[in-house]
Curated annotation (Swiss-Prot):
Keyword Electron transport among UniProt keywords: no
Family: Belongs to the pseudouridine synthase TruB family. Type 1 subfamily.
Lineage: Bacteria, Pseudomonadati, Pseudomonadota, Gammaproteobacteria, Enterobacterales
GO biological process, one term: mRNA pseudouridine synthesis
Function: Responsible for synthesis of pseudouridine from uracil-55 in the psi GC loop of transfer RNAs.
E.C. number(s) listed in UniProt: 5.4.99.25
Keywords for the protein's UniProt record, in alphabetical order: Isomerase, tRNA processing
Enzyme class, UniProt record, top EC level: isomerase
HAMAP family attached to this UniProt entry: TruB_bact
The protein's name: tRNA pseudouridine synthase B
Length: 314
């Protein structure tokens, strides 16, 4: 006879996990999901196993709004090994070419400048983008290269940190869809020596505060602490969560009176004062400003529901 399945928790919110090196984003997600005993969770914007840093984990209804984090800008610290090119553009791959490092400081500065601003980038074959329904890295592992179109990205800031020996350290603030491994590989080719990533840390996602990041070790320590104090682990874990609407924090807020919000929550567009002329909005209700979903201003100036929060019974 099978054991009864433990009932998970319907929790909502976003945890800013500091992903450890050597672990896939999905493995990290599953570990956090078990620690929180959550029924539903997903991550936004996968990090390579080699990479560390901010990985937002969305619980429950927050998963509905995770797309807004995928669309947000990000900041990274990266260290490149010069003189070696690998098949994956990072240290997890095989070295495919070695060349001497002979560029000058002036040549480096000029090369870096070509990556600032609006540029186009051809994604790496070792990425999760799909071609004919199959992920690119699945083709790459079979030794197959498929055509990829260049995609527009924006490098808002590219800071030179240091160049010592065959190591180059940079900090990069970039738009969604930017592959740091590809930037380093392309930079290595511009410098004529080849390069690959040996260290990568995501410092920030959108406007999330870096001081709210937590490690798996800290989460486990809180669970142990709760057991010692004979209290539910949720009492120590849940205060770490950011609000479920935080992925959409860049959008303006429209507050509806309770008399209007009931229609909005039933799927109907409503009129209200103080709404912007167009675009997406975060919708709250009542005096306490409870978040109830995302809306969009329609052609008649009404707030039309786009994504609604489902309220589960306690």
């Amino acid at each position: 006879m099978s054991r009864p399945r433990r009932r998970g928790r319907d929790i909502n919110g976003v945890l800013l996990l500091d992903k450890p090196q050597g672990m896939s984003s999905n493995d990290a997600l599953q570990k956090v999901k078990r620690i929180y005993n959550a029924n539903r969770a997903g991550h936004t914007g996968a990090l390579d196993p080699l990479a560390t840093g901010m990985l937002p984990i969305c619980f429950g209804e927050a998963t509905k709004f995770s797309q807004y984090l995928l669309d947000s800008d990000k900041r990274y610290r990266v260290i490149a090994r010069l003189g070696q090119r690998t098949d994956t553009s990072d240290a997890d791959g095989q070295i495919v070419e070695e060349r001497p490092v002979t560029f000058s400081a002036e040549q480096l500065a000029a090369a870096l400048d070509t990556f600032r601003g609006d540029i186009e980038q051809i994604p790496s074959m070792y990425s999760a983008l799909k071609y004919q329904g199959k992920k690119l890295y699945e083709y790459a592992r079979q030794g197959i290269e498929v055509p990829r179109e260049a995609r527009p990205i924006t490098i808002y800031e590219l800071l030179f940190i240091r160049h010592e020996g065959n190591e180059l350290e940079l900090e990069i603030h970039c738009s969604k869809g930017t592959y740091i491994r590809t930037i380093i590989d392309d930079l290595g080719e511009k410098l004529g020596c080849g390069a690959h990533v040996i260290y990568l840390r995501r410092l920030a996602v959108s406007k999330y505060p870096v001081e709210r990041m937590v490690t798996l070790e800290h989460l486990r320590e809180l669970v142990e602490q709760a057991e010692q104090q004979d209290i539910p682990a949720a009492e120590l874990l849940d205060p770490l969560l950011m609000p479920m609407d935080s992925p959409a924090s860049d959008y303006p807020v429209v507050n509806l009176p309770l008399t209007s919000s009931v229609y909005f929550k039933n799927g109907n567009p409503v009129r209200t004062s103080g709404a912007p002329l167009e675009g997406l909005v975060r919708v709250t209700e009542g005096e306490n400003g409870k978040f109830i979903g995302m809306g969009e201003i329609d052609d008649e100036g009404r707030v039309a529901p786009r994504r609604l929060v489902v309220e589960y019974p306690a």
